Amino acid sequence: MKLVWFVYESGSRGFKAIRKYLDKFIGFFTTDGYVVYKVYDNEEHPQQLRSSCLTHIRRYLVDALDEHRELIMWFIDEVGRMFAQEYESKKLGESSEERLKRRLKHTKPIMGRIKDKFESLARNKFSKLGVLTVRALKYMKNEW
């Protein structure tokens, strides 16, 4: 079942509003980097499996394009390769099991390359990178 659900309670998407709905949820859900979702990133909530929104990550990267075009385009292209795998899976009408196999075979290596590149930059303390580039990379790190 595919569902998009935005939770606002009394105009808030704060901790209480989110917990009211997601504590009973079983499965995967995708979020932005809003801190209240981080409660589901630990062993306390084994049935709620949070993943990060690649569109949000890509948006931060696009914001940094003018600072370090070649570097940022490398990350954007890698994210695009992940999107292409999802598109292909959808186009072929793959089952959940087939999609998982595709992700393990094709998407996992892409994520490995992204992580390696990111960690290399982090070891150098993001030296000589602009403010927006560092912001994009830190957002990505926090969502990893």
Regions found by a protein language model. Give the residues of each.
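Catalytic center-proximal scaffold of phosphoryl-transfer enzymes
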Residues: 1-144
